[in-house]
Amino acid sequence: MQIILLEKVANLGNLGDIVKVKDGYARNFLIPNRKARRATKEAIAEFEVRRAELEKIAAEKLAASQAVGEKLNGQSFEITQKSGVDGRLFGSVTNGDVAELLKKAGYEVEKLQVRMPEGPLKMIGEHNVQVALHTDVVVDVTINVIGDHA
């Protein structure tokens, strides 16, 4: 399916690009999330009329994400979980737990924005986690997992 992108999409293209994607990806993700529209002649003409407005909105989102990223980058947060004497956690710290921790600290972060390269945290200690605030703004935070010996 040919679509026109209404915002920058990672690994796909930038605002205004006309790309071919699988039908399911377009119908189930891009179009419902208002990231794209079908590339009909009418949609392309309407996009060209609204291009400046959409570029302004995209620039505002990027600026807001960069401002939050500057505050968040390099910060350290602590989370306490039950653990055994060997330092392994009972359960794990997931991206949802990290997102909730960041929300409590005053940052508006969804769990899909939290990237954990090593997977869920299963040991006590300091771990680096990435937060993708925007496709162009990815910051590193440190999560210090403290063991609560049961």
Swiss-Prot record:
<keyword id="KW-0689">Ribosomal protein</keyword>
<dbReference type="InterPro" id="IPR020069">
    <property type="entry name" value="Ribosomal_bL9_C"/>
</dbReference>
<comment type="similarity">
    <text>Belongs to the bacterial ribosomal protein bL9 family.</text>
</comment>
<protein>
    <recommendedName>
        <fullName>Large ribosomal subunit protein bL9</fullName>
    </recommendedName>
</protein>
<dbReference type="InterPro" id="IPR036935">
    <property type="entry name" value="Ribosomal_bL9_N_sf"/>
</dbReference>
<dbReference type="GO" id="GO:0019843">
    <property type="term" value="F:rRNA binding"/>
</dbReference>
<dbReference type="GO" id="GO:1990904">
    <property type="term" value="C:ribonucleoprotein complex"/>
</dbReference>
<dbReference type="InterPro" id="IPR020594">
    <property type="entry name" value="Ribosomal_bL9_bac/chp"/>
</dbReference>
<dbReference type="GO" id="GO:0003735">
    <property type="term" value="F:structural constituent of ribosome"/>
</dbReference>
<dbReference type="InterPro" id="IPR000244">
    <property type="entry name" value="Ribosomal_bL9"/>
</dbReference>
<dbReference type="Pfam" id="PF03948">
    <property type="entry name" value="Ribosomal_L9_C"/>
</dbReference>
<dbReference type="InterPro" id="IPR036791">
    <property type="entry name" value="Ribosomal_bL9_C_sf"/>
</dbReference>
<keyword id="KW-0687">Ribonucleoprotein</keyword>
<dbReference type="GO" id="GO:0005840">
    <property type="term" value="C:ribosome"/>
</dbReference>
<keyword id="KW-0699">rRNA-binding</keyword>
<dbReference type="GO" id="GO:0006412">
    <property type="term" value="P:translation"/>
</dbReference>
<dbReference type="InterPro" id="IPR009027">
    <property type="entry name" value="Ribosomal_bL9/RNase_H1_N"/>
</dbReference>
<dbReference type="Pfam" id="PF01281">
    <property type="entry name" value="Ribosomal_L9_N"/>
</dbReference>
<keyword id="KW-0694">RNA-binding</keyword>
<dbReference type="InterPro" id="IPR020070">
    <property type="entry name" value="Ribosomal_bL9_N"/>
</dbReference>
<comment type="function">
    <text>Binds to the 23S rRNA.</text>
</comment>
